[in-house]
């Protein structure tokens, strides 16, 4: 297993404090076997100010959906997002383990705006999407550690949907 795969496996097993960021230069095969995200039929999407290919898969050993965001030439993993991560626990558990985030950004869950729901720990390469009112963490994003001012241009994804 690679260091990226090992780190994701430790995170999956419930240790948020063990996550210190996606290693710079991580390639898609480096995520195996912790993440199974086949390279076929990726979608293109905005990641910060960049365009990325998104591969959809699962966190190995679970039914948790995983997204692997890679550079357009698929050479480097920029971000791994995991939906409904039970290993994160409730929002208050995250705060107990990691303390207050460096950034609290507004995001949305579907069509519901959630002010301050994107908790960014840029020095850890971690963003936690929390609905404090419902006591639920609904997404985590894993990336290479950065300065707080770099997060929005490199890794930010606005998740809200518009009503028709």
Show which residues each predicted segment covers.
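Short helix/turn-capping signatures at newly exposed starts of structured segments
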Residues: 1-117, 121-123, 131-164
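Terminal recognition/anchoring or ligand-binding modules at protein termini
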Residues: 128
